[in-house]
Amino acid sequence: MEQTWRWYGPNDPVSLADVRQAGATGVVTALHHIPNGEVWSVEEILKRKAIVEDAGLVWSVVESVPIHEDIKTHTGNYEQWIANYQQTLRNLAQCGIRTVCYNFMPVLDWTRTDLEYVLPDGSKALRFDQIEFAAFEMHILKRPGAEADYTEEEIAQAAVRFATMSDEDKARLTRNIIAGLPGAEEGYTLDQFRKHLELYKDIDKAKLRENFAVFLKAIIPVAEEVGVRMAVHPDDPPRPILGLPRIVSTIEDMQWMVDTVNSMANGFTMCTGSYGVRADNDLVDMIKQFGPRIYFTHLRSTMREDNPKTFHEAAHLNGDVDMYEVVKAIVEEEHRRKAEGKEDLIPMRPDHGHQMLDDLKKKTNPGYSAIGRLKGLAEVRGTGTGSGA
């Protein structure tokens, strides 16, 4: 596995020198300063590439080239946004960057309710609390029909939870959900958020798949032509939320993608922390079935709680994900490729780490503090070595 590290650009509190000292050789980054939908010019790509290479590293993966909401809703200037996306892929290929992670989650990217969940050892993790999310949706956002997505017990618990929240609790929960987490290219006010949700009122799973198919059929041939590998990131969490459909959550969704556009440029990011939230997702089976199309991996674990829709981010080798078997399956896929004469290692990055030790005193991007990821990278590296990497 190629050891990589996500870096949010020059404003990231974690420097490229830190990344190199952590033992990573590749960088996962994006041009976050370019508005959604606009073309990434060769000039801007080369600027970022030079910064990375001057630090003794390589730009291994783009995460992400964001998809404009008009494409997801199939409205407005979606054709122009698709054309821009095609050009960005051509420009990336021209600059020698050929692995692109992206997602097709509507409105929100990855979502958490608590960004400072204190673990028994005093370190902090990210958490998704199903009851707090229900309290937000029903009592703060006041989304019409939200009650239909929850059990009677969850509705009652959410009402009690909301009643105990201070104004600051409500404001913090709202910020955590809609203000945009690291890597998300959109942040919203509450009113803006309601308006964006309204755009999806007539879009169910079938319709969102239809819109995704339009995107794939336009993008994948260009990626194939220029030698770019597209690696879709799963939904996080991998289930419908806020009345929004999710279409990259299960092995069945993966098969749908392959059936829709059967090109080797149409591939996957194996994010164990996203897929692994669902108990019915067999991650090892996913890797074995779609291994040749896995072009990027995010390795972390989550722990489901008493309410199985509530989870927190566990240590990399703990939690509900059997990381040894996952890494072993990835290494076996790399060996298969080598036997066929291919030399393409699968880039791996230690996904969200715990905020711990000296990082507890620092301002960090949620999930992306240095020391927790350093620990995770070392643990996953050792797991890879032990499994035959």
UniProtKB/Swiss-Prot annotation:
Similarity comment: family membership: Belongs to the mannonate dehydratase family.
Gene name per UniProt: uxuA
Pfam families (alphabetical): UxuA
Enzyme Commission number(s): 4.2.1.8
Function: Catalyzes the dehydration of D-mannonate.
Protein name: Mannonate dehydratase
Pathway the protein takes part in: Carbohydrate metabolism; pentose and glucuronate interconversion
Swiss-Prot/TrEMBL catalytic activity: D-mannonate = 2-dehydro-3-deoxy-D-gluconate + H2O
Record GO biological process: D-glucuronate catabolic process
UniProt enzyme class: lyase
Swiss-Prot/TrEMBL cofactor(s): Fe(2+); Mn(2+)
An annotated Gene Ontology molecular function: mannonate dehydratase activity
Disulfide cross-links: none
Keyword terms: Iron, Lyase, Manganese
PANTHER family in the cross-refs: MANNONATE DEHYDRATASE (PTHR30387:SF2)
